[in-house]
């Protein structure tokens, strides 16, 4: 076997391989002989058909099997010979093999970038200071009351206000023409819930029962329907009825119906613990993301094209799934993806770069996930979920799930290592803009 490597780009390689005629003929003979023994051909006993007859009937199938056999064997040998470790699926090119002739094929793939760790200890990273606002407890309590609210028809002659339910008829118009799917009859709209575009609910506030009003508004940009984004629109609105929201009092009797603590002080304490736990997790997750971004910034890594394509496609698919759940159609989705293409690419690049750097740091400091780390995590999951540990192990025995968990635990160990030397700059809560797409 002869082989050579072409450097297509910094991280792309093309491996050219030539298999000698003798090896090709051996592969042909092995496969023809196997078929000859297996098949039954009319006029001959099983396994007794002449080889020439077998070749005439099964030649195309044999060529496919020969290609598979030769590539499977000699591709692996060539990789080992040139000490190559592809990180992408190879793209093979070859012509049909011929008996007693050399067989040439090539494999194109990407390789890992060489990682040079320049600065990863003593990184300076901003972190939000945990500050609990007691008003959030009151907000949760109000949300609980609102979830159990009842509504009563307002008999008095008064204007509708924020918090009321406005029962309306409405018609939308663009350029004087009716807006498709832009009308409703006896629609119950809670003012302040922001169910409609900006300005719609504010425009209804102050109206009285029986009053009709025209609202001149504009669709937001961006908007889930790209063809409407930023366009002016008019809504003709008639207020049919006003319903006032009646909130239950936070009595012990009411609290008992919630299935949790039956006294207010215990409930408040429980709410505070949940809020603090949620906020702590948000701050820690955001800090980890900024730490990894800083790591990438301080240690530039070239991204293999195939991984970029794959990771970006995965991000776009996740985004598509989220948006479709919110009612976005294919045309609108395509417009959004085009608009945010650069953001998808940037995020994909940072994810790939950080994974390479995490791997390099783990290798240098022996931080890779070990069996005891996995066992501890399995036990933790079992305790949290109540699921038998054997079933959890079975789930993570699947290659894809095992790979994800192993990387997650390795990343956790690397983050813990980096946290030992990181220089944290505390900033007020809510002062940092998160970049999530």
UniProtKB/Swiss-Prot annotation:
One of its GO terms (cellular component) is cytoplasm. Its EC number is 5.2.1.8. It is an enzyme of class 5 (isomerase). Pfam families: FKBP_C, Trigger_C, Trigger_N. PROSITE patterns: FKBP_PPIASE. Its main location: cytoplasm. It is found in: Cytoplasm. Residues 163-248 form the PPIase FKBP-type domain. GO terms for molecular function: peptidyl-prolyl cis-trans isomerase activity; protein folding chaperone; ribosome binding. Keywords: Cell cycle, Cell division, Chaperone, Cytoplasm, Isomerase, Rotamase. It catalyses: [protein]-peptidylproline (omega=180) = [protein]-peptidylproline (omega=0). GO terms for biological process: 'de novo' cotranslational protein folding; cell division; chaperone-mediated protein folding; protein transport; protein unfolding. Consists of 3 domains; the N-terminus binds the ribosome, the middle domain has PPIase activity, while the C-terminus has intrinsic chaperone activity on its own. PANTHER family: TRIGGER FACTOR CHAPERONE AND PEPTIDYL-PROLYL CIS/TRANS ISOMERASE, TRIGGER FACTOR-LIKE PROTEIN TIG, CHLOROPLASTIC. Belongs to the FKBP-type PPIase family. Tig subfamily. This is Trigger factor. It comes from Bdellovibrio bacteriovorus (strain ATCC 15356 / DSM 50701 / NCIMB 9529 / HD100).
